[in-house]
Amino acid sequence: MSGLRVYSTSVTGSREIKSQQSEVTRILDGKRIQYQLVDISQDNALRDEMRTLAGNPKATPPQIVNGNHYCGDYELFVEAVEQDTLQEFLKLA
């Protein structure tokens, strides 16, 4: 797969995960950055792919990937936004 992907889930009981996913997509949309939303709840293989790319067998959404390069999780995303290094974080610069 190529391009920017945000791994998320449409099925979660966690308000925290829902909130984090919404914030990531809101910021990307606001900056007009194109991405593909990958719903891991639809296929266990997608969840496994997300965890493999993240290098963490317990990784939870949202996780951000560009091509086959892992960018980071929600905390790293927010840090990049706050430090105005989002383009570098997303491997777009």
UniProtKB/Swiss-Prot annotation:
Its main location: cytoplasm. The modification N-acetylserine is found at S2. The keyword Signal does not apply. Disulfide bonds: none annotated. InterPro entries: Glut_rich_SH3-bd (IPR006993), SH3BGR (IPR051033), Thioredoxin-like_sf (IPR036249). It is found in: Cytoplasm, Cytosol; Cell projection, Ruffle membrane; Nucleus. Keywords: Acetylation, Cell membrane, Cell projection, Cytoplasm, Glycoprotein, Membrane, Nucleus. Residues 2-93 form the Glutaredoxin domain. Coiled coil: none annotated. Glycans are attached at T9. Gene3D superfamilies: Glutaredoxin. GO terms for biological process: cytoskeleton organization. The keyword Lipid biosynthesis does not apply. It holds the Pfam family SH3BGR. SUPFAM superfamilies: Thioredoxin-like. Could act as a modulator of glutaredoxin biological activity. May play a role in cytoskeleton organization. Homodimer. Interacts with MYO1C (via its IQ motifs); the interaction is dependent on calcium and takes place at membrane ruffles. This is SH3 domain-binding glutamic acid-rich-like protein 3. It comes from Mus musculus.
